[in-house]
């Protein structure tokens, strides 16, 4: 099962992070959480393990109107929120990989009517954000 939408861009990591933030904002998403995986691994494991992962940022993106609709439709759906967006250094020089969770995979766990429509709208917005990069 494919659970991610992925694009690779030819821009440096830090520049791509800002581009992703801007693209998500344009689509009505705010960033609720931010996990710098490299820094966390350096602090909790070792610098060598952090370097093996490289630059890797997990952004927890939330579109408040969609989240409100989802939570009022199925209160348990909050266990699957927010939508994760990963920005990580790509394999090639100057490449950065951006990935977003496919909301359709998340809502397969809910049997509440209406959740699929909300997930489709979130998916459309996430794809638009990735497409603008």
Identify the function of each model-found stretch.
Residues 30-32, 37-81:
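Compact, glycine-rich, soluble single-domain proteins
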Residues 107-133:
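Well-ordered alpha/beta subsegment
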Residues 22-26, 76, 128-131:
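Short, intrinsically disordered, mixed-charge
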